[in-house]
Amino acid sequence: MPPKSRTAAGAKKVRRKEKKNVAMGEAHIKSTFNNTIVTITDPTGAVISWASAGTVGFKGSRKSTPFAAQMAAEAAGRRAMEHGMKKIDVFVKGPGSGRETAIRSLGAIGLEVGTIQDVTPTPHNGCRPPKRRRV
């Protein structure tokens, strides 16, 4: 099979990032035991910016720290503020250690935090949980 060559017609199309002017939005913080992911959307749910502890530069077990969650929230919040965001409602999901620090850092960079809701999914005795960890 001949190697694929890139031509002008077959080149990847890169979409330009357009400046959305959104004053109010939602911050979805997913905090697991291993990582923290912060996604900022407009009220309809379209993603404006996102960051995780891994994209900010933390690797391995350092991703699960509250400081990594703080840095991820600041990075996502600053990118959202470039699009004109001023006020956010926060939705927190998961049991991780970076929940509170992520919320605090969103307020510290200048975003006005409105409501804070915990949307962690809890089973009505559905799937069997993983076995207990023995160290």
From Swiss-Prot:
Residues 1-22 are annotated as: Disordered. One of its GO terms (cellular component) is ribonucleoprotein complex. The keyword rRNA-binding applies. PROSITE patterns: RIBOSOMAL_S11 (PS00054). Coiled coil: none annotated. Keywords: Ribonucleoprotein, Ribosomal protein, RNA-binding, rRNA-binding. One of its GO terms (molecular function) is structural constituent of ribosome. Part of the 30S ribosomal subunit. Interacts with proteins S7 and S18. Binds to IF-3. This is Small ribosomal subunit protein uS11. It comes from Nocardioides sp. (strain ATCC BAA-499 / JS614). The lineage of its organism: Bacteria, Bacillati, Actinomycetota, Actinomycetes, Propionibacteriales.
